[in-house]
UniProtKB/Swiss-Prot annotation:
Protein name per the record: Phosphate regulon transcriptional regulatory protein PhoB
Post-translational modification: Phosphorylated by PhoR.
InterPro entries reported in the protein's UniProt record: CheY-like_superfamily (IPR011006), OmpR/PhoB-type_DNA-bd (IPR001867), Sig_transdc_resp-reg_PhoB (IPR011879), Sig_transdc_resp-reg_receiver (IPR001789), WalR-like (IPR039420), WH-like_DNA-bd_sf (IPR036388)
Gene3D superfamilies per the UniProt record, alphabetical: 3.40.50.2300, 6.10.250.690, Winged helix-like DNA-binding domain superfamily/Winged helix DNA-binding domain
Length: 229
């Protein structure tokens, strides 16, 4: 599935060029020409990344970032600012407000795509990874599927993220706090016991195939994902 990118840019020639480049590189661009239309695009399916101009009719890029960070469903969407404001102070303001990267106009299409991919690797590794396999269990980040052989396993989005983290970090013990930081993120305030709830749900989802044994409790420490039973 193509990664969905919201392009928020009021200058039509730049917006159209960016969308063309994104399509040529396998992304799915969604256009917004001003602040209000950008806000209206914040719904499911959520964008995987937002390219955001600094100055917009109806509001500023910084205001838009602040709006994103206030809402639980949008606060983790990565943002790359796309603007003519190249002064160091402006770059710092953008990054401190919550932007993940900053591209100054004019820019090359190659640099734009490279920066988008770099941000996705850093912020959302599942967006660029191949299928992960372990002991007959396979997880495909692109299609968001977990399989055992030809049989799909049904699980919620949090359990999927938890399993993805475990399968990319096997044989290591993680405390509840570490799992919260890695899977939920440092900006989300939830209790440690939330991890236990989702561990139980993950085990339940893996139970039919027998892979629930791989999610192991390490008493007094936390949890480990292991092929050693």
């Amino acid at each position: 599935m193509a990664r969905r990118i919201l392009v928020v840019e009021d200058e039509a020639p730049i917006r159209e060029m960016v969308c063309f480049v994104l399509e040529q590189n396998g992304f799915q661009p969604v256009e917004a020409e001003d602040y209000d239309s950008a806000v209206n695009q914040l719904n499911e399916p959520w964008p995987d990344l937002i390219l955001l101009d600094w100055m917009l009719p109806g509001g500023s890029g910084l205001q838009f970032i602040k709006l994103l960070k206030r809402e639980a469903m949008t606060r983790d969407i990565p943002v790359v600012m796309l603007t003519a404001r190249g002064e160091e102070e402006d770059r710092v303001r953008g990054l401190e407000t919550g932007a993940d990267d900053y591209i100054t106009k004019p820019f090359s299409p190659k640099e734009l795509v490279a920066r988008i991919k770099a941000v996705m690797r850093r912020i959302s590794p599942m967006a660029v990874e191949e299928v992960i396999e372990m002991q007959g269990l396979s997880l495909d980040p692109s299609s968001h599927r977990v399989m055992t052989g030809d049989s799909p396993l049904d699980m919620g989005p949090t359990e999927f993220k938890l399993l993805h983290f475990f399968m990319t970090h096997p044989e290591r013990v993680y405390s509840r706090e570490q799992l919260l930081n890695h899977v939920w993120g440092t900006n989300v305030y939830v209790e440690d016991r939330t991890v236990d709830v989702h561990i139980r749900r993950l085990r339940k989802a893996l139970e039919h195939s027998g892979h629930d044994r791989m999610v192991q409790t390490v008493r007094g420490t936390g949890y480990r994902f292991s092929a050693r039973f």
